[in-house]
Regions:
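Nucleotide-activated donor-binding/catalytic signature segment of Leloir-type glycosyltransferases, i.e.
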Residues: 241-262
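Short alpha-helical donor nucleotide-sugar binding micro-motif in glycosyltransferases
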Residues: 86, 143, 261-262, 269-274
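Conserved acidic donor-binding segment of nucleotide-sugar-dependent glycosyltransferases
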Residues: 105, 309, 319-329, 336-343
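Acidic donor-binding loop of glycosyltransferase active sites
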Residues: 272-287, 303
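Carbohydrate-associated surface elements
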Residues: 155, 176
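A short, histidine- and acid-enriched strand-loop-helix "catalytic/donor-clamping" loop
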Residues: 15-16, 100, 114-133, 145-148
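Conserved donor-binding/catalytic core segment of Leloir-type glycosyltransferases
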Residues: 9, 186-216, 232, 277
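Short hydrophobic beta-strand element within catalytic cores of glycosyltransferases
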Residues: 295-307
Length: 374
């Protein structure tokens, strides 16, 4: 008789998304995978070829928005009926060491007998002093229970070491992108030039600095005027209306298109049509850019990148793109003028790109699961 596939349950709270989970599609011949998805999930899952299971949460009964998120946090976030969904699992794969859903799994681990794997993006070692009291309790439940932690970057690994996680329980395992899908996409850079600022429309993603850089280019601040340059701001989020008003205030409203998040399969063509990706991430008191999947997607597409030097961005981008100080829209405009708008289109190092491939990411995850259950 053929050996049954070990069951793996994926937990991402309200943040299940295609770019994180898609590489795991490759493991379905070997493992029985499913992702639990709440009714309040923040991302579209179009095109994800993994089984998903709808699970209730207290937030589902609240209106959308940050206020609802704060209310749900105060009430206590949780999956409803999680125990039954995890019963019989060989591996539960959650994320981060201070999240409600990882803590909920950790508290069920001994009773249900599964192994607990965590993907960790966090690059700031909060320890206990800088965590909210509830997150301290989450951390205290999670760290003793976690069998293996998959740090997405070296910076995340180093943060875990400062959290006193033993080094032998940490594996650096970057996420993966379907490189061939992006490299093979049709399309050429547009004329007039098009800048792409993609990501959730929140302050810390720095779309406002991308708009400032565009305005500087149009007005000739720091060099010859470039009124021909346009911008596509791609994403959804609470800053959408404010960013539209700001583009108009800066005098570039007619040169900026705002488009909601598109299905993931449409992204390769957008990269290929862009003159440059602009990633203006801004560190906050509680966050810095933890990876930047758009960087790898742009590299795979051959699209130049100008990005803020924040968090793990330098580690991921390497020598491929130009880095500017976070918030320095003038330097961003100068870098765009000197590089992508001057016709430069760099080639990514194939060895670097291969490390970020979906196939490599899937292989690393397979090895992680097998190391715990074989």
């Amino acid at each position: 008789m053929p050996r049954s596939r070990p069951r793996v349950v994926l937990l991402r709270g309200h943040n299940a998304n295609v770019w994180d989970l898609r590489p795991l599609e490759r493991l379905q011949d070997e493992f029985e995978l499913s992702a639990l998805v709440t009714g309040s999930n923040l991302h579209r899952l179009d095109g994800l070829a993994l089984p998903t299971v709808e699970v209730g949460s207290p937030r589902d009964k609240l209106p959308a928005g940050r206020a609802a998120g704060a209310a749900a946090y105060a009430l206590g976030e949780r999956y409803l009926g999680l125990e039954e969904h995890l019963r019989g699992a060989a591996v539960v794969h959650a994320a981060e060491i201070g999240t409600w859903f990882s803590a909920q799994a950790a508290r069920l681990k001994e009773e249900l007998g599964f192994r607990l794997v965590l993907t960790v993006w966090e690059t700031i070692p909060w320890r206990g002093a800088y965590r909210w009291p509830r997150e301290r309790r989450y951390r205290d439940a999670i760290l003793p229970a976690a069998d293996l932690l998959l740090a997405t970057t070296g910076r995340a690994r180093d943060a875990l070491l400062l959290e006193d996680v033993p080094g032998e329980r940490i594996v650096v395992s970057p996420p993966g992108v379907e490189l061939d899908r992006f490299a093979a996409a049709s399309g050429t850079p547009q004329d007039p030039p098009l800048l792409l600022s993609a990501g959730r429309l929140v302050w810390e993603k720095g779309h406002q600095d991308a708009l400032r850089a565009l305005a500087a280019l149009h007005r000739g601040i720091g060099g010859p005027p470039r009124p021909d340059v346009r911008m596509l701001v791609l994403g959804d989020g609470p800053e959408a209306a404010k960013l539209r008003r700001y583009a108009a205030d800066l005098g570039v409203g007619g040169a900026v298109e705002f488009r909601p998040t598109v299905p993931y399969d449409e992204m390769p063509a957008l990269y290929r049509s862009a003159t440059s990706l602009v990633l203006g991430s801004l560190p906050t008191r509680g966050w810095e850019e933890q990876f930047g999947m758009v960087l790898v997607e742009a590299m795979a597409s051959g699209t130049p990148v100008v990005a803020a030097d924040s968090g793990a961005i330098p580690e991921v981008l390497g020598a491929y793109g130009a880095l500017v100080r976070p918030g320095d829209w003038k330097a961003m405009a100068d870098a765009l003028r000197a590089g992508p708008l001057g016709g430069a289109r760099p080639a990514a190092d194939p060895a670097v790109l291969a490390r970020f491939s979906a196939a490599e990411a899937a292989s690393r995850t397979r090895d992680a699961y097998r190391s715990l259950i074989d």
